[in-house]
């Protein structure tokens, strides 16, 4: 049996208090590039990804800052668009009437994460911050010790996937992120110095270790979606087991229509790089989603997908899946 390491749990009641506790316990000074086990303090919401990682000793924080008692952490509120607090569970997001009616891609993505039990615990904020994955990293401590570790936990070791690579190639696998990028979402982040808003795509960088482009003392507070009038969206994914697994490749697409003509379009892909890939979808603008326009957009996705041999599926399978699932997504939007 894999057991959790010892840690101390602190339970703030406000976002500001949570950010302050992170800084007080050394988050700002910590550097995950020194190896994931070196991080002294971490946030926990649902814990559906963090606790298994801790059991495998991928992380061994001395302090966990729980968001479970933060006031308003699970609110979903309508305005000109939609604001979702980071503590809202994936089930709450997937079944919210406004999400299912106006933001279909998000409802589909949130509903495609793992199993119902884990969606009842896992949060939208946790999915945004989901750790990158790799077959060399997501193993027990015993397994990794026998193999000599990898760059993500021990930076002095080469990347086992590509030994000549100067960076970790672990893959981004969150389902909700491409959906939110395709929907034009912004994220609110807070630290001890205050709050700021970012385009969601700015939250990530192409690095399997330091995959978040925010500080270790930053807290994701909420995600805000713009008004979806005139937009259609969808999310589709390929995975080993259709009831449980992370995406081998996942594609979110959103188009704004004037009649049947596309006036704006966004496509984002997960599971094919260390960050979610926002794809240039301008080839769709001005079209009526004819087959040749869809094929052109799918070709852009195919060329921009650069999976490595580090998760389920072969490289060619994942790259082809990105193309095929883009075509499926766009056809479903055309025929809706």
Feature-to-residue mapping (PLM):
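C-terminal structural segment of proteins
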Residues: 1-336
